Amino acid sequence: IANASHEKAKLMKAAVRFYQGDKIHFDKLMDSEVKQHSWMRSFSWAFSLPNPPQLHFSKWYFLDAVMEQSIHSRPFYEFGVWRASSFKYLMKVFKSGYGFDTFTGLPEDWDIGRGVEKAGSYSADGSVPIIEGGEFIVGTFEDTLPVFYSEPRPIASVINFDADLYSSTICALTYSKPVIDEHTILIFDEF
């Protein structure tokens, strides 16, 4: 792709066209160096399913669809809050939410396949949001989750795993088992 700053737009456009039945642009990208991009791998997997899932080409449309199917009387949990844009959006429907983050950025380097996001990327400069109905637990998951889950917690309606790193996501998932039941919706943002 000539201009890397337009890479994600081109990938998304090709995926939308593919989803609408025009496979030419997507197939061309699959024959290029962006074949290993995490989005391309995700799109390829989704398009290979016998019954492709409903796709939402916007984080906000996706969250709207999740909220329509969720139990609003339960809280949501979010692992990886950063600047709390998703958290604030979810609070439009839920009465309470728990957010977990260091607010100082990634705790370790993150290899994204085309480069590395350095430890400290996605920092909120230590600024913890103040949102009515929200409770924020500050620190690494390894340090905070054993303490947080040492007490009974309400079953989750939605859990948004947006920690980016596999190590952080698997830690959060492992500790969250007590708040997951058959009605809990799990969201896995890239990791």
Segments from the language model and where they lie:
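Short acidic/polar alpha-helix capping motifs at helix-coil junctions
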Residues: 27-31, 50-53, 141
